[in-house]
C-alpha cells in the first residue's frame, strides 16, 4: 500500500534533515578549529620556547664581542710565539724584559683580543645558569707602572668574556704610576669603553689599600679582584658568581692558569687543579688535593676547598668582605695579605674554595717586578693576630721577623674577638690537617754550626721546582734561618722544613748527604734518614756507620761529607744555635 506524505510530514522530515546537517557541519568546524587551535598553540609554545632560549643566550652575551680569530696571528689560541729579531730589536726586547720582567716586546705584537682555546671539562661547558638570579660583580684591577699591552689585554679579556648582565663595571686603580702612557693616553683609551672606570691614588698606597679604594667605589654585589696581567677564559665568571649566590660566606678563586712570561703560551690546567697551602715561613705554596677533599666532593666540577689562596685573583661578596673586616690596612705594599685573609676566612666561619670551571690565565713574571720590603712585617702581623702559639714556628724560621715593627694590631684582635673566630689549632686540624707541625724542641732546632770550621753552618739550597735536587753543603752562618734552619726530631730525623718537609739522607754507598721527602706523620721512618746527634757533638748515621764531617776542598771551599767517625776530629763536632 503506498504511503502518502502530508505537507506537515514533509516539513518535519526536512527539519530533521537540516538539524542533522547542522550538527554535522558544527562538528566539522569544531574539529577544524580545535586542530587549528592546537597547531597555533604548538606554534606559540614553540615560539615562546625559542624566545626563552634566545633570551638565555642573550643574557650570556659579553659586553663586547671578540673580533674573529686569526689562526696565523701571533699568540692566537694561546700558542707560544717567538720573534726573529735583529740585533737592535733583540736589545729592545731585553731592555723591556729588564724593566717589566715580562717579554713586553712580544706582548705588544700580540692582539689585545686574542682567542684562548677553551679546554674546560665537558661538565663545565654544559652548565646552565639562571642569569637573572646571579649576583652582579665589580671587577677591581689595581696596577702600578704596568705595561700597556698586558694591562689592556686584561681589560679587554674581562669585557669580552663576562656576561654584560653580570658585569657592573671594571674599576682600574692606578697606584701612582709614573709612566707617561698611563696618564692621558690611558684616559683617552678607556673613555671609549663602556663600564670601565679609572681611579688614581694621590700617593703610593700598595696593593692592599689600592684594592680597598677600588672596593669603596664598587656597585656590584660581588667584588672580583684580578691582577693587571691576566686573560680570562670563556665562562670564567658565572661559576664564581653562582657559588657566591648560593653561599655568601664562600670566597671563591678561579683556577689560575699560567701564561709564559717569555712566549705568552697559555697553559690551561685540564686535570685536577692544585690548592693553596703555606710553609712555616708563611710563604704561599701549591699542593695537590688531599684524599679527604676528593672524597667529600660529589662531582668533579664541585668547588674545591683550599686552606689558602694565592691572593691575586678571587671573588667575594661585598657585604661579606665588609663583615670580615676587608683587608688588614696595616699591611704595606704586598705580600702576606693573602695568607692573613685566608686564615681569617676559615677561622671566622667562612670557606675558601677554588672553582674548577673558572679559568683565568696569569702572567707569572720572570721575577717580582718590584720589591716587597715589608713582607716580614706583613707576615708577622698575620702571625700575631691569627696563629696563636703556632707563631713560634714562623719566628724560629725567620729570626729577623722577631725584630719587625709590625704596627698596632689591637683593632685586628678586637675584630677576631667580635667575629668569635676559631683558634689556629682548629684551623690546622680541620682545614689543613696534612700540614706537618714541627716539634721545635728546645735546643734542637736552628742553624747547625761546624766547630771545626766555625764560620760555617749546614746549608741546603735546592734548585727551583726540584726540592730534592741538591746536596747538603756548608755556607757562612748568617742567622737568617731559611736555608740554614734545621730541626732534629724525636724520630731522629734531621728535617729541613722551612720550605717543604725534607729529611737528610745518605744514599747507599755514597759519602754525600742528600735530601728526600720525609715520611708522612704516623708512617715508618726509613733507616737511611735516622741520625744520632750524640752528646759529644758528633752526628752519627747508623745505616752507613759514618759521621757527618766538615772539610775543605782542594780549592779551599768549605763543604760537608760522610767520613769514618773520629772523636778527635773537630770537623765532626756540631752544635745547634738560634
Swiss-Prot record:
**Keywords, ordered alphabetically:** Disulfide bond, Glycoprotein, Glycosyltransferase, Golgi apparatus, Lectin, Manganese, Membrane, Metal-binding, Signal-anchor, Transferase, Transmembrane, Transmembrane helix
Tell me the pathway: Protein modification; protein glycosylation
Region: Catalytic subdomain B, residue numbers: 303-365
Which residue ranges traverse the bilayer? 13-35
Gene designation: GALNT4
Q: List the disulfide bonds.
A: 124-357, 348-421, 457-477, 503-518, 547-565
- Ricin B-type lectin domain location is 444-577
Quick one: which residues bind Mn(2+)? 227, 229, 362
Q: Name one GO biological process term.
A: protein O-linked glycosylation
Sum up the protein's function in the record's words.
Catalyzes the initial reaction in O-linked oligosaccharide biosynthesis, the transfer of an N-acetyl-D-galactosamine residue to a serine or threonine residue on the protein receptor. Has a highest activity toward Muc7, EA2 and Muc2, with a lowest activity than GALNT2. Glycosylates 'Thr-57' of SELPLG.
What protein is this chain from?
Polypeptide N-acetylgalactosaminyltransferase 4
Cross-referenced SMART domains, in alphabetical order?
RICIN
Listed binding positions for substrate are 175, 204, 334, 370
In the bilayer, the protein is annotated as: Single-pass type II membrane protein
EC assignment: the record states 2.4.1.41
Please give the GO cellular component terms listed in this UniProt entry: extracellular exosome; Golgi membrane; perinuclear region of cytoplasm
Q: What is recorded about the protein's domains?
A: There are two conserved domains in the glycosyltransferase region: the N-terminal domain (domain A, also called GT1 motif), which is probably involved in manganese coordination and substrate binding and the C-terminal domain (domain B, also called Gal/GalNAc-T motif), which is probably involved in catalytic reaction and UDP-Gal binding. The ricin B-type lectin domain directs the glycopeptide specificity. It is required in the glycopeptide specificity of enzyme activity but not for activity with naked peptide substrates, suggesting that it triggers the catalytic domain to act on GalNAc-glycopeptide substrates.
Q: Where in the cell is it found?
A: Golgi apparatus membrane
Which lineage ranks, top first, belong to the organism behind this chain?
Eukaryota, Metazoa, Chordata, Craniata, Vertebrata
Family indicated by similarity: Belongs to the glycosyltransferase 2 family. GalNAc-T subfamily.
Amino acid at each position: 500500500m503506498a504511503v502518502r506524505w502530508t505537507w506537515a510530514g514533509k516539513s518535519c522530515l526536512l527539519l530533521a534533515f537540516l538539524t542533522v546537517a547542522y550538527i554535522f557541519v558544527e562538528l566539522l568546524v569544531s574539529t577544524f578549529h580545535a586542530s587549528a587551535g592546537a597547531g597555533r598553540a604548538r606554534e606559540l609554545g614553540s615560539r615562546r620556547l625559542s624566545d626563552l632560549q634566545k633570551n638565555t643566550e642573550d643574557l650570556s652575551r659579553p659586553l663586547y664581542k671578540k673580533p674573529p680569530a686569526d689562526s696565523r696571528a701571533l699568540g692566537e689560541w694561546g700558542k707560544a710565539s717567538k720573534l726573529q729579531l735583529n740585533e737592535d730589536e733583540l736589545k729592545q726586547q731585553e731592555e723591556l724584559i729588564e724593566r717589566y720582567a715580562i717579554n713586553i716586546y712580544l706582548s705588544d705584537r700580540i692582539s689585545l683580543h686574542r682567542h684562548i682555546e677553551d679546554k674546560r671539562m665537558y661538565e663545565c661547558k654544559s652548565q646552565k645558569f639562571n642569569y637573572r638570579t646571579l649576583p652582579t660583580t665589580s671587577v677591581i684591577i689595581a696596577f702600578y707602572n704596568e705595561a700597556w699591552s698586558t694591562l689592556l689585554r686584561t681589560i679587554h679579556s674581562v669585557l669580552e668574556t663576562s656576561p654584560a648582565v653580570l658585569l657592573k663595571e671594571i674599576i682600574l686603580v692606578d697606584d701612582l704610576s709614573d709612566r707617561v702612557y698611563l696618564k692621558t693616553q690611558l684616559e683617552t683609551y678607556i673613555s671609549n669603553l663602556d663600564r670601565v672606570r679609572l681611579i688614581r691614588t694621590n700617593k703610593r698606597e700598595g696593593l692592599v689599600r689600592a684594592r680597598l679604594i677600588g672596593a669603596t667605589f664598587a656597585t656590584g654585589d660581588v667584588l672580583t679582584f684580578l691582577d693587571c696581567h691576566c686573560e680570562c677564559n670563556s665562562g670564567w665568571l658565572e661559576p664564581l658568581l653562582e657559588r657566591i649566590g648560593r653561599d655568601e660566606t664562600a670566597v671563591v678563586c678561579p683556577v689560575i692558569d699560567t701564561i709564559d712570561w717569555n712566549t705568552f703560551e697559555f697553559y690551561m690546567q685540564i686535570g685536577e687543579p692544585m690548592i693553596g697551602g703555606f710553609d712555616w715561613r708563611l710563604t704561599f705554596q701549591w699542593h695537590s688535593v688531599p684524599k679527604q677533599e676528593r672524597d667529600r666532593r660529589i662531582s668533579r666540577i664541585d668547588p674545591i676547598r683550599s686552606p689558602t689562596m694565592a691572593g691575586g685573583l678571587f671573588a667575594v661578596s661585598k657585604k661579606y668582605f665588609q663583615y670580615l673586616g676587608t683587608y688588614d690596612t696595616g699591611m704595606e705594599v704586598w705580600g702576606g695579605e693573602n695568607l692573613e685573609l685566608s686564615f681569617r676566612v676559615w677561622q671566622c666561619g667562612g670557606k675558601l674554595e677554588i672553582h674548577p670551571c673558572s679559568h683565568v690565565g696569569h702572567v707569572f713574571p720572570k721575577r717580582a717586578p718590584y720589591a716587597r720590603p715589608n713582607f716580614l712585617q706583613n707576615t708577622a702581623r698575620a702571625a700575631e693576630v691569627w696563629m696563636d702559639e703556632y707563631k713560634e714556628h714562623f719566628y724560629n724560621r725567620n729570626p729577623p721577623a722577631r725584630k719587625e715593627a709590625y704596627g698596632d694590631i689591637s683593632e685586628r684582635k678586637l675584630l677576631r674577638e667580635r667575629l668569635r673566630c676559631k683558634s689556629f689549632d682548629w684551623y690546622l686540624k680541620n682545614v689543613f690537617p696534612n700540614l706537618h707541625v714541627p716539634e721545635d724542641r728546645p735546643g734542637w732546632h736552628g742553624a747547625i754550626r761546624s766547630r771545626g770550621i766555625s764560620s760555617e753552618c749546614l746549608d741546603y739550597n735546592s734548585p727551583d721546582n726540584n726540592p730534592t735536587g741538591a746536596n747538603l753543603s756548608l755556607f757562612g752562618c748568617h742567622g737568617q734561618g731559611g736555608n740554614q734552619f734545621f730541626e732534629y726530631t724525636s724520630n731522629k730525623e734531621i728535617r729541613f722544613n722551612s720550605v717543604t718537609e725534607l729529611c737528610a739522607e745518605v744514599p747507599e754507598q755514597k759519602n754525600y748527604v742528600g735530601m728526600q721527602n720525609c715520611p708522612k706523620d704516623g708512617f715508618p721512618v726509613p733507616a737511611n734518614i735516622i741520625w744520632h746527634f750524640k752528646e759529644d757533638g758528633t752526628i752519627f748515621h747508623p745505616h752507613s756507620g759514618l759521621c757527618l764531617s766538615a772539610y775543605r776542598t782542594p780549592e779551599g771551599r768549605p763543604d760537608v761529607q760522610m767520613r769514618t767517625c773520629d772523636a778527635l776530629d773537630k770537623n765532626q763536632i756540631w752544635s745547634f744555635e738560634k
